[in-house]
């Protein structure tokens, strides 16, 4: 799991490293990634996105208002900041610049924003290399997994490939901060895991998972949890703060 990120970090190490650094080097690399907050304990890689090791769940039938959309998701988000990120509020303040900068297709917005927020809430910090402190702080994560998200049928995307790439620039504590987003959605006939299970993966220090509904609201999206699934639709007006699922067949979820 997270092999792509692990490999990416490892390649940044000096190519002149001796092959004789066997056991000690391997043990050190097991704690390379740290949790996003600088004052938190190191994060073991085995705790990061543990769900990727679990078997995929069967796809549920669609309700009368929402349909299951399934994609193979290949995604990565990286934040590069001169000033360190000290807490969750600072992180969300940086990540929220996408609210005004989203220019992707309307039909895939629920997917893009949900995946984006899932990664943002599970970012890890790249440590200093060989004890040398870098002039910038890098926070990143990503995954490659088949996932299912329930979308209002009036806004359901087509069964085709979608891609969203974005480089955003903002400031953090008066310093430049960049956000690099790469999300690919590939159509598949395979069964997917509920994205709710992904978003609610425990954080390493067991802190409370941010409320998904509150996280989505600034992006003009609304979500309803039903039978362990997220049902997502676009928020059409300022007074449109809830989802009516009364016409959905309870047995179909």
UniProtKB/Swiss-Prot annotation:
Protein species of origin: Tibrogargan virus (strain CS132) (TIBV)
Keywords recorded for this protein, A-Z: Host membrane, Host nucleus, Host-virus interaction, Membrane, Viral budding, Viral budding via the host ESCRT complexes, Viral matrix protein, Viral release from host cell, Virion
GO molecular function annotations of the record: structural constituent of virion
Function: Plays a major role in assembly and budding of virion, by recruiting cellular partners of the ESCRT complexes that play a key role in releasing the budding particle from the host membrane. Condensates the ribonucleocapsid core during virus assembly.
Protein's name in the database: Matrix protein
Record's keyword annotation contains Membrane: yes
Gene Ontology terms: cellular component: host cell nuclear membrane; membrane; viral envelope; virion membrane
GO biological process, one term: viral budding via host ESCRT complex
Span of the annotated motif PTAP/PSAP motif: 55-58
Topology term for the membrane: Peripheral membrane protein
Domain notes from UniProt: Late-budding domains (L domains) are short sequence motifs essential for viral particle budding. They recruit proteins of the host ESCRT machinery (Endosomal Sorting Complex Required for Transport) or ESCRT-associated proteins. M contains a PTAP/PSAP motif, which interacts with the UEV domain of TSG101.
Location within or outside the cell: Virion membrane; Host endomembrane system; Host nucleus membrane
Stretches for region Disordered: 1-26
Keyword Disulfide bond in annotation: no
Pfam families: Vesiculo_matrix
Quaternary structure annotation from Swiss-Prot or TrEMBL: Homomultimer. Interacts with viral nucleocapsid. Interacts with host TSG101.
């Amino acid at each position: 799991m997270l092999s792509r990120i692990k490999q990416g970090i490892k390649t940044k190490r000096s190519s002149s490293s001796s092959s004789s650094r066997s056991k000690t080097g391997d043990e050190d690399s097991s704690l390379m990634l740290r949790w996003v907050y600088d004052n938190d304990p190191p994060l073991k890689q085995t705790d990061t996105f543990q769900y990727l090791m679990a078997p995929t769940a069967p796809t549920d039938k669609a309700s009368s208002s929402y349909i299951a959309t399934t994609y193979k998701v290949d995604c990565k988000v990286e934040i590069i900041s001169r000033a360190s990120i000290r807490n969750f509020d600072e992180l969300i303040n940086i990540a929220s610049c996408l609210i005004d900068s989203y220019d992707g297709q309307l039909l895939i917005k629920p997917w893009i924003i949900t995946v984006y927020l899932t990664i943002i809430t599970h970012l890890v910090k790249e440590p200093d290399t060989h004890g040398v402190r870098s002039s910038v702080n890098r926070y990143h994560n990503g995954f490659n997994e088949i996932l299912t998200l329930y979308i209002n049928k009036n806004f359901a995307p087509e069964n085709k490939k979608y891609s969203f790439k974005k480089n955003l620039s903002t400031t953090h504590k008066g310093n430049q901060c960049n956000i690099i987003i790469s999300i690919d959605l590939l159509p598949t006939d395979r069964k997917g895991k509920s994205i709710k299970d992904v978003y609610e993966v425990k954080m390493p220090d067991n802190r409370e998972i941010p409320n998904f509904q509150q996280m989505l609201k600034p992006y003009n999206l609304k979500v309803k949890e039903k039978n362990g699934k997220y049902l997502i639709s676009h928020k059409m007006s300022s007074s449109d703060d809830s989802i009516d699922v009364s016409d959905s067949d309870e047995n179909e979820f």
